[in-house]
Curated annotation (Swiss-Prot):
PANTHER family per the UniProt record, alphabetical: PEROXIDE STRESS RESISTANCE PROTEIN YAAA (PTHR30283:SF4), PEROXIDE STRESS RESPONSE PROTEIN YAAA (PTHR30283)
InterPro entries assigned: YaaA
GO biological process: response to hydroperoxide
Organism per entry: Streptococcus pyogenes serotype M49 (strain NZ131)
Pfam families referenced in this protein's UniProt entry, alphabetically: H2O2_YaaD
CC per GO annotation: cytosol
UniProt-recorded name of the protein: UPF0246 protein Spy49_1742
Length: 243
């Protein structure tokens, strides 16, 4: 069985379905630090303006006082990649695929199933805090490595931010898809292409119930197709021709 890892997103949209917010034990230490930060501290940590930091501070305070509601993560996150993932009107098989084979890597919650209930928050591995004297990446590394040992065949749709959270020896069987546009024989890639394509790729995997590495090579989605000459055992390249 294939396991997919996807990143979080800064952009969020409140879905209809909500739950009580139950915070994992490993996240409690992070919440304690974030909830104690002033607006000025948060602005520096996030590198945002103080006005925006006020909103984030309120979210942390609400979580600390157990006032937050939680929402299925894949529905709450609404960044460009998430908007290109099929999230509504799923078949029973697609719903099972999404909730059992897709996991989200978070610097606040750890690695969680795609439908895990989470609260509104802003947090990533660039957030400048120390937990028990450790960086966020060091703090989460044992948890992330344990997940990798339990799920050796991972399809990673993660950005470079996560490269050194996992130890290298945990990623020997990992495959990272790469998405490129071809125009007049020239290949290019950029953030927008990649984010849209990640969502479309995951949707195609769900719809086709891909369970083997070889099945990924026959996928055609949003104009992309597998390019064997540019691909390696650990990097599958998908090309889309532009007019």
């Amino acid at each position: 069985m294939l396991t997919f890892l996807i990143p979080t997103a800064k952009e969020m949209m409140i879905p209809k379905e909500s739950h009580p917010h139950l915070l994992p034990q490993d996240s409690q230490a992070i919440l304690k630090i974030m909830a104690a930060m002033t607006t000025e501290d948060l602005a520096k940590s996030y590198r945002i303006k103080e006005e925006a930091a006020k909103k984030e501070q309120q979210r942390w305070q609400d979580m600390a006082s157990q006032q937050s509601l939680a929402y299925p993560a894949y529905q709450l996150f609404n960044g460009l990649m998430y908007r290109h993932i099929k999230r509504d009107k799923l078949t029973t098989q697609e719903q099972a695929y999404l909730t059992q084979q897709v996991y989200i890597t978070s610097s606040f919650y750890g690695i969680i199933p795609a439908n895990h209930p989470i609260a509104e928050h802003r947090h990533d591995f660039h957030t400048r805090i120390k937990i028990e004297g450790q960086s966020l990446k060091s703090y989460w590394r044992p948890c992330y490595n344990q997940f990798a040992k339990e799920h050796p065949q991972v399809i990673s749709l993660l950005s470079s931010e996560f490269d050194d959270v996992f130890s290298k020896d945990c990623k020997q069987l990992w495959i990272s898809p790469k998405f490129m546009a071809e125009k007049e024989g020239q290949f290019k890639t950029h953030s927008t292409i990649s984010k849209k394509a990640r969502g479309a790729f995951l949707t195609a995997c769900m719809e086709n119930n891909c369970q083997t590495v070889d099945s990924l090579k026959s996928l055609v989605f949003a104009g992309f197709y597998y390019h064997p000459d540019l691909s390696t055992d650990h990097e599958f390249v998908y090309i889309k021709k532009e007019a």
